[in-house]
Amino acid sequence: MKLNEHIFRANDIRGIAYEDLNEQVVSLLGRSLGSEALSRDIKDLIIARDARVSSPEIMEWLSSGILSTGCNVIDIGIVTSPMFYHSTFELAASSGVVITGSHNPAEYNGFKIVFKNQSTSSDEILLLRERIINKDFQLGQGKLDKADIKESYINRIVKSVQLNKALDISIDCGNGAAGVVAKEVYEKLGCNVIELYGNPDGLFPNHHPDPSKKENMLDLIDSVAVSYTHLTLPTKA
């Protein structure tokens, strides 16, 4: 097996889907994650994903690897990164991984990992790599469950935020994972929402969901010019 060691970054793991992150590599990463979790007395890992085309398969490969160690998996489906972090406090499990390419090009994907409500450090990322290289895996048969944390996430925000007046806002979800929740959150806060590209689509047919690039903001700028909203909100994948 060829393992591109450059996928192991300072605080996450990322590379090109189906090349750097192929079935064998991702399954081994799952075995490494499950084994490391069990060594810390963590018996359950939450797994989430973004809307990228490669994410469902990568989720299957990763889950398979984790389950093969005896560690359990809780699948929470397509969520934003903040929703994933919320789940580690809301659910019984305080650890997990979200499969996301963030703002990187569509062919990329990656993993953000949390153990006991703490994001992994660079040293912990290297520990996962060493487990793969040394084949230091536990064996067992974990259990797969599913959970929906959308309602609890929305309720948490609504209880924490109070607006002085109803706002007219424009949101560009860029066909990313934000589309599963953004409009509903702001409507429950009392806002009038104009939503662009709220349907999650990993091909990103309208523009790439990276608001740091001016060209990805043009549709939102046009929307504001027409609607005169109080606030504009671009989102990442």
Predicted regions and their residues:
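Short glycine-aspartate micro-motif
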Residues: 94-98, 170, 231
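Conserved strand-to-helix beginnings and helix N-cap segments that scaffold or border functional pockets
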Residues: 56-60, 125, 183, 232
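Gly/Ser/Thr-enriched, mixed-charge loops and adjacent short helices
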Residues: 109-227
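Conserved small/polar residues in nucleotide/adenosyl-binding loops
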Residues: 229-237
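An N-terminal, well-structured beta->alpha segment
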Residues: 1-64, 68-69, 149-167
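Active-site flanking residues adjacent to catalytic metal/cofactor-binding acidic residues
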Residues: 11, 49, 100, 171-174
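Short, glycine/acidic-enriched loop or turn micro-motifs at the edges of active sites
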Residues: 15, 53, 106, 175, ...
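Ferredoxin-reductase
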Residues: 40-116
